[in-house]
Amino acid sequence: MVAAGLGVVPVSARDAVLARAARLGTGSREVLDVAALIGARVELDLLESVTGCPPAAVDEVLGSGLLAGDGGWLRFRHEIARLAVARAVPAHRRPGMHARILAGLGLLGCSDDARMAFHAEAAGDQPAVLHHAPRAARRAAGLGAHREAAAQFERALRCAAADPNVAAGLYDGLAHELRVVGRYRDAVEAGEQALGLWRQAGDRVREGDTLRNLSYALLSMGRGPDVVAAAEAAVTVLEPLGPTAELARAYARLAAARMLFSEHLAAIELAMRAQAIAEPLGALDALSDALSTQGCSLARTGGEGTGHIRRALDVALSAGLDSEVGRAFSNLYYVYASQRRFAEAERYFTDGVGYCDEHDLDTYTAHLRGERALALERTGRWDEAVALSTEQLAGTDLSSLYRLCPLHVLGVIRARRGEPGAWEFLDEAAAVADACGEPTWIIPVRLARAEAFWLHGAPRLAAQEAERADDVAAGSDGWERGAVAAWLRRTGSPRPPRGELAGPYRRQAASEWAAAARAWDSLGCPYEAALALHDTSDEAALRQALELFTGLGAPAAAQITRHKMRQLGIRSIPAGPRTATRAHPLGLTRREREVLELICAGHSNAEIAATLVLSTRTVDHHVSAVLAKLGAPSRSAAAAHAARLGLVGAAEDRQHRS
């Protein structure tokens, strides 16, 4: 149903419609006006009940061509016609007509609360709005239509006659729905309204639960200290009241807050407390949340936490808990991707975004897309990372917290490519991360800034940024500690590594550069592999690093590598791809041209790797770059395009001359 007043009606169309309507008799015009206010499809028995007009009046309207019959229904032939008629109904008559429609729907046993709430509001019937709108909101939320749910709560709150207790409950519901759909500032305002009203009413249970919900909304605003304060206050209010579902939710929320500040042992203990209360009470939302948090903290302390998060997802899916489903998908993708288990992460991104888009879970969609951009950056798919990050930042309603990943990605890739504007992104990212106060956000942003300074030839400033990351890394996982250790060493900081390091970082800390590079390559992280090779003094490794940087389109790191090679007295250093690349009609590097020639010859990636003495991971990256530069969706399309441009023949001529 489209509410009257929405949409644009061209003047010419309006005049044509109203000219037809003016030719109707009085009773028939009443039928037309009521039909326009009912909606796009009109039950014939409802229309007759509301207007009391004889069938002849309906026949006259049908004869005008504005309405058409459809069994027991009537419908406007064009929505523009309905809008034109509805807007022409005099304002003083509309409330009475909507009141009659509302009464007619009631007599017919209408169970559509959203429809009833619409007509009740238009009729000025506040008790009816307060009856139907909250019911419509809860039904919409249960169906995953969270924007509609928020709109219905807002409709109910427009009734000034609502008593404080009723209003408090409505604000609570609204705050939750607004947070889910990404309207964070409005969610905080609604939560604060609810909190004041519950305190005024002296309802401690609802006060505590509202504080817990408010903590969620504050999290999405990037207000880290306030997140913890609200969660702690919720527990303080609810603990004296005994083991309730509300207390289980509060423990789960405080556990999540502790996790975000890298207090993982406390987070795990609180999550287990929440589960002990939630499971016997059947508080499945609290159970899912607690399992999700416990899994994340276990993963970040060296344990295998994904099993807990998968159980959290199963619990939420089976109970139809949209918000908890979105959180579990987001956490699964984050954990797998942060551990560089990209193949395992992929399904949770695809399934998660699909679910979140379908259920209006904008908060978790934003989180998934941000983490996806980081994964694309880590795997050398920079064009895709830039495209996704740019698309995210174009969203006007994205909160500061969910701007962090795209800001980080765009800043660091611009720095690597030697493009202008890197600091614009990295400065904003640092401001947001520092305000949030969470190590999970501070560390990657400070390391991105360390890299940017290093690439710009400012090692002292780079070391300072790496040390700022190290300052908050005590509770981080081995991957974050490893990244911090690598940049401390690379930038010349005297600080030693903290604790156990994960994956290839252990090899780097032990100066096993070749092994580290192979490990990065096996994980699909070509830029990290190149950095590991750069950190050695071995000529062959440095040449390989230079080739990788060049192939990735990272001229700043390539130039630093050339400078290091010159300092080591290495001769015959490749000057870079610029002249050859510019001469090539598609801008392919030398290695990419070799890969293209072998693609055209029908070689598989494994065969190309054997021919060029490269790893299959490196070849995968080169093939992706070639397809992108040719604008080809497949290898066969790339070969056909190269043949049309005459590139294959040129390759064969060189082979025959050699």
Regions of interest found by a model, annotated:
Residues 58, 98, 102, 120, ...:
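Inward-facing hydrophobic residues that define packing positions of alpha-helical scaffold repeats
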Residues 93-216, 229-238, 508, 515-521, ...:
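Repeat-based scaffolding regions
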